[in-house]
């Protein structure tokens, strides 16, 4: 079993093709049978530019600190499926420095984040529902 990850769908397709060719060549040379199956295939998550801008401006208005990550998250994410059917944006709220990450055994959700995060989501929802300019541009 192997886990493959790529930033773009095209890169993943090429990676799977090349790896399959190499493994098949090795199996053939050793006289072995080979069965390849893909499970939990997730499309890449690509943020819509307009929605990303809307999240940024709304977060700034709410007094949030905005930090850009240098590299995309490498975990599997089924959120990419949404982007195939409608504009979407995936962003993190963040718990700040000094907190164990999500899957760490000592992770404990910081409840202080709830009010601010819910308020941010509420404002984003209102803008997308009632602001005709926001709707037109997305």
Label the model's feature ranges.
Residues 1-138:
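Metal-dependent amide/peptide-bond hydrolase catalytic core
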